[in-house]
UniProtKB/Swiss-Prot annotation:
ATPase subunit of a proteasome-like degradation complex; this subunit has chaperone activity. The binding of ATP and its subsequent hydrolysis by HslU are essential for unfolding of protein substrates subsequently hydrolyzed by HslV. HslU recognizes the N-terminal part of its protein substrates and unfolds these before they are guided to HslV for hydrolysis. This is ATP-dependent protease ATPase subunit HslU. It comes from Desulforamulus reducens (strain ATCC BAA-1160 / DSM 100696 / MI-1) (Desulfotomaculum reducens). The keyword Cytoplasm applies. InterPro entries: AAA+_ATPase, ATP-dep_Clp_protease_ClpX, ATPase_AAA_core, Clp_ATPase_C, HslU, P-loop_NTPase. The gene is hslU.
Length: 466
């Protein structure tokens, strides 16, 4: 894990997310505290638990993106879960422990990818050798067992001749392999075909079973059945280029110690994992209501509580402690309030950050400032058709103003409004782009107003289209 200072973390997040300084600072400090904890003495490490964060703010202002970018920044296992997907224990649906299992799966996948990259060069060399062997296989050595009568009537001479012939073939194959290696180094064999053996991924009778019934045990039925019914191998005819990819994966798998990888991945999930609980306001029990749905919501909160507090969850990779996993909960809290969550759960999210609604200037910055801004994305997309597209400064101001106005008049969906507006604005250009190869188009404020005037002025129409 990279040891970034809070200021460095905020600076990195600024490359992708506009505004929301309070939220960025909160997650940056939480991240730095993990690094500080790792420097403590053994007797104190277990005592220091992460301070979980509750983000409050409307949709589309950057709650999820802040958490996702943070995890990517430090290469930490990250899962985003919607709290509304969970049901109480005993009811049909996903149980809350599944989020910890998902986190471990993510950690295994991440670490496996890292290990594969580490051994990739070696695996490629081994794969190339296997390709050479398949293209020019050595002949089988002639059997030495002979009939006793043959030994009496010149059988020894025949055997010597066969051995000599086999040695000659071997010499020829060695020379052929050297020639193939030279051709391979010059990439002259890439389009040649050969047959390789691959594992058949299908498992017999898997459709009879359902993973959901055994999910709470942390058991994958495909793995269980895979050990009962060994996977069959089948032959595939592929090019040398494709064969190299397949065989490199196979060789990389052999070079990786999966037991060691699993132990490291579980440890990484426990110490550095981030679980993002979205829509947590939807499971809050509102004051003065006592319906069956509210009882269910309260039950889900009580089920989440021990995991956030710190408990041990059984997975197919072994027990996983949740004591030091960072939980970031988020919700709009339009109807419910944070105080509508059960008191015990409120206490487990001591850091509360309110994210602000986006202003006109925020929308303008979102269009151009982030590293992979929306304007850059659309410009590059249409550029693949040979169409050069440019947005003038006043067109960006106009687009930002329309996004802000429509959000104020209708549902406030934050920065996502820009996606719908840009899609509508560039609808005709995207359709005609293949016929405009080699041309240039400048989009100014007049063009924006012309394309969007009907939608913006008609409130009912904007509600459906934008």
């Amino acid at each position: 894990m990279e040891a970034l200072t809070p200021r460095q973390t905020v600076r990195e997040l600024d490359k992708y997310i506009v505004g929301q300084e309070k939220a960025k600072k909160a997650v940056a400090v939480a991240l730095r505290n993990r690094y500080r904890r790792s420097k403590l003495k053994e007797d104190l490490i277990d005592e220091v638990v992460p301070k979980n964060i509750l983000m409050i703010g409307p949709t589309g202002v950057g709650k999820t993106e802040i958490a996702r970018r943070l995890a990517k920044l430090v290469k930490a296992p990250f899962v985003k879960i919607e709290a509304t997907k969970f049901t109480e224990v005993g009811y049909v649906g996903r149980d809350v422990e599944s989020m910890v299992r998902d986190l471990v799966e993510t950690s295994i996948r991440m670490l496996k990818q890292e290990k594969v990259e580490e051994v990739e060069e070696r695996a490629k060399r081994l794969a190339d050798e296997r390709i050479i062997e398949l293209l020019a296989p050595y002949p089988n050595r002639p059997t030495q067992t002979k009939n006793p009568f043959e030994m009496l009537f010149g059988g020894v001479q025949d055997t010597q001749q066969e051995d000599k012939s086999w040695e000659q073939q071997n010499s020829r194959i060695k020379f052929e392999r050297e020639t193939l290696r030279e051709k391979m180094s010059r990439c002259e064999l890439e389009k040649d075909y050969l047959e390789i053996e691959v594992e058949d991924q299908s498992t017999p009778m898997l459709e009879v079973f359902s993973n959901s019934g055994v999910e709470e045990m942390g058991v994958n039925m495909q793995d269980v059945l895979g050990s009962i019914f060994p996977r069959k191998k089948r032959k595939r005819k592929v090019t040398v280029e494709e064969a190299r990819k397949i065989l490199t994966q196979q060789e990389a798998q052999k070079l990786i110690d999966m037991d060691e990888l699993t132990a490291q991945a579980v440890k990484r999930a426990e110490d550095h994992g981030i679980i993002f609980l979205d829509e947590i306001d939807k499971i809050a029990t509102r004051e003065g209501t006592t319906g069956s749905a509210d009882v269910s919501r309260g039950g889900v909160q009580r089920d989440i509580l021990p995991i956030v507090e710190g408990s041990t969850v059984m997975t197919k990779y072994g027990p996983v402690k949740t004591d030091h996993i960072l939980f970031i909960a988020a919700g709009a809290f339009h109807i419910a309030k944070p105080s509508d969550l059960i008191p015990e759960l409120q206490g487990r999210f001591p850091i509360r950050v309110e994210l602000e609604s986006l202003s006109r200037s925020d929308f303008e910055q979102i269009l151009t400032e982030p590293q992979n801004s929306l304007i850059k994305q659309y410009t590059e997309l249409l550029g693949t058709e040979g169409l050069k597209i440019e947005f003038s400064k006043n067109s960006l101001v106009e687009i930002a103003d329309i996004a802000y106005t429509v959000n104020e008049q209708n549902e406030n969906i934050g920065a996502r409004r820009l996606h719908t507006i840009l899609e509508k604005l560039l609808e005709d250009v995207s359709f005609e782009a293949p016929e405009l190869n080699g041309q240039s188009l400048t989009i100014d404020s007049d063009y924006v107003r012309e394309k969007l005037k009907d939608v913006v002025t008609n409130r009912d129409l904007s509600r459906y289209i934008l």
